[in-house]
Amino acid sequence: MAEALSQVGNIGGQPYWSWYGFEGRVEWCACFVSWGANECGYIENGIIPKFAGCVNGVQWFKDRGQWADNSIEPTPGMIIFFDWDSPNGSSGSQDGLSDHVGIVEKCENGIVYTIEGNSGDACRQRQYPVGYYEILGYGIPAY
């Protein structure tokens, strides 16, 4: 958590996307989560995957039975996945695919506090109500 918090304010996503192996800027939210996990030894120990695509991160946690839907009250260190897009750009329900990812900092009084990379092209702290419709669910690392 301290490693992620130390990055709040970073603009543009360096060093996260270049650490991952990309030669130029990409959508870097998952690179940020992976970079932080690597800095803490979690990738090497199989606790959090190295992933650049949110859908791949979701599948990794689901394959290991380490997934929870958006109805839970998450705990610090869980990986929060978002679903912003509706099917075919229509209004209504989401398309069920993750478009963004961050790290749960804490959950208090029905509010989920997060640390996110590529939130407006910066590392930022954000907050959402528990059960917010754009939260797809949570990866639950086995720390």
Residue positions per predicted region:
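...with weaker cross-activation on analogous glycine-rich loops/strands in unrelated enzymes
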Residues: 43-121
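N-terminal capping segments
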Residues: 1-45
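Intrinsically disordered regions, especially transient/low-confidence alpha-helical propensity segments
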Residues: 14-16, 25, 32, 57, ...
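Active-site signature of cysteine proteases
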Residues: 109-143
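Generic detector of well-ordered alpha-helical segments enriched in charged/polar residues
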Residues: 1-5, 58-62, 136
